[in-house]
Design a protein with these regions (language model features):
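Active-site microenvironment for binding and transforming phosphate-containing groups
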Residues: 1-179
Length: 179
């Protein structure tokens, strides 16, 4: 596997697999990035459907009990305890975050951009796990790099107003710009 195909070094949860690949991987290898075939191409899990969502940069969570042929509308987090089901997220600049109980009984996938982070997409998803989140593991997939994501003072101040501990995540660039 090259740098265009990534997975966590350690398992996220029992029987939970995470895969992340870039659009370039498909083009370089002359593979059609058709969503319905992704698991079949890259794993032995050809009969497992992937549930996608139409992401809106918010914090809405949808609990999935069974696969739908259509993406779940207006949501940024999918949660399930259903076996033989994969949850999928499409990202560019935003963070793909996978969560799972260590025993694999509950799992979630999040689309976490700055709007979702400010509105609590991670926190709202963690509340869905039974018996709290002390035995929940996370994997954050690839996203835009710090050096390529300049933001203004307004966004910096929004994060500081939510949590002043956010300051360590920003680098002052000057002229009301932050990385």
């Amino acid at each position: 596997m090259g740098p265009d195909f990534l997975k966590p070094k350690a398992p996220l949860g029992k029987k939970i697999q995470c895969l992340s690949f870039t659009k370039d991987y498909f083009y370089k290898n002359n593979i059609s990035p058709e969503k319905s075939r992704i698991l079949k191409i890259f794993t032995k899990l050809e009969d497992i459907p992937i549930q996608y969502m139409n992401q809106v940069h918010g914090n809405r969570l949808e609990t999935i009990f069974s696969h739908s042929a259509f993406p779940i509308d207006e949501t940024d987090s999918l949660f399930s305890s259903t076996s033989n089901l994969a949850l999928g997220v499409l990202t560019a600049d935003c963070l793909p975050i996978a969560l799972s109980k260590n025993d694999g009984s509950e799992f979630a996938i999040l689309h976490a951009g700055w709007k979702g982070l400010l509105s609590g997409v991670i926190e709202s998803t963690l509340t869905s796990f039974t018996k709290g989140c002390s035995d929940v593991s996370a994997w954050i997939g690839p996203s835009i790099s710090l050096k390529n994501y300049e933001v203004g003072n307004d966004l910096y101040e929004s994060f500081m107003n939510k949590d002043d501990g956010s300051e360590s995540n920003f680098i002052w660039k000057g002229h009301d710009k932050w990385l």
